From Swiss-Prot:
Listed Pfam families: DUF4693
Species whose genome carries this gene: Bos taurus
GO biological process, any: positive regulation of smoothened signaling pathway
Function, in words: Acts as a positive regulator of ciliary hedgehog signaling. Required for centriole stability.
Gene that specifies this protein: TEDC2
Recorded superkingdom: Eukaryota
Record-given protein name: Tubulin epsilon and delta complex protein 2
Location of region: Disordered: 45-72, 93-146
Disulfide partners: none
Chief place of localization: other
Coiled coil: 8-33
InterPro entries on file: DUF4693
Amino acid sequence: MLPAECSRRLVAELRDALDSCAERQRQLEQSLRVSRRLLRVWEPAETPAPEPTPGSEINKEAPSSACPPSPQDLKELELLTQALEKAVRVRKGLSKAGEGVKARSLKSGSASTATKASAPPSTSRCTGSRAPETKPPRGVHHPWVPAKDLPGHRLLLVGDGAHMGQGAGANKPEAGLRDQQIVPQAASQVPEAFTLKDKGALLRLPEAFRKAASRNARLPMCASSLWAQLSSMQTRDSVDAAAATAKTQFLQKMQTAAGLPSSMLSAAEVGRLQKACSMLRLRMREELTADPKDWTQEYRSLLTLEGLQALAGQCLHRLQELQELRSAVVEQPQGPWPEGPPRAALPCGGGADPVWSPQLLLYSSTQELQTLAALRLRVAMLDQQVHLEKVLMAELLPLLSEQEPLGRPWLALCRAAHCLLCEGGQRFLTVLQDEPADRLSPP
């Protein structure tokens, strides 16, 4: 049996391992849910059916829930129906009477036209002789004279002055009906007002006016094209500025996500600093060992030493910045900064040291990516097993060293320790205890 303190420590370590495994399993399940949600077939969300309003439900239920009509309502409905039928009959009678009057007026008008055509041309009763005028054929259209220029505000045909006096006594009703028919027709054919905006294209302007009009018409087009070019240039400049800003922000976000500061430490800069330091050291040694012959050489030597001192101060300042940068990177949880120079390029597909530059994960197929994920999980599991093995070694080896190597309990303890430490609990060793040779020999 293990001591109580040792058992508690081992149980605590095992519980921590189980908790970490459960947390890892939860993260994997969440990642799987997100991946399935992204890879499933996208379907547009169905539009929800409009919910019926309470008013419509009331209207639908009203006929079914309405009470039967009373006898008084039925009587009023019958009276209303009779009144409507009577109104329809009266309206039909009026329409028939109007059609008869219209037919009689048309017949009388045709008869008067025939008599006018058969009668010889007669002169007008007005003073002054006029040439006989013949009535134009029926298909010819007569221009209308505005009614405001004639007495009585009537619209008359041009050239019908000779026939104004005929049939005045006998055909007065027919003439009245004809006047009533002519007035609406003339009113509908009143000439439209002439506007320069609608019909100005029919005018023939002088040559100078036409040239000026065409030149003025081209100016707005040129101005609009210039404005379009200016707006396109401004839009292009704004798009370029927005793209540059977005690129800078993206690089800053990538550097922040990778855990690297903006002023990254590069191997080339370290090499340049080392070369500058070695050259400064050599030059300083040459100037100090030189023996000036006169005050001019001594003055030049002092100026050279002053310049070398300024360069050395700049190099020291840069080295201090790099040291601060290194300490800041080491304190971050992403991993320590490399202490030595950059190593050779690793065959991992990234093309550079994964510590000195961001490592790129390259894969050629989904199967290779799946294999990489499985190997990553396997490495995490092996790291956890190694940690548990170290804890078991720290707890069990002192117990083995304290007990004497005698008897079966010690052999069972060794077997259990070997199984837990060396085989990972997968296989148990079988220990055989042989009897001495003299006991097995016959007497």
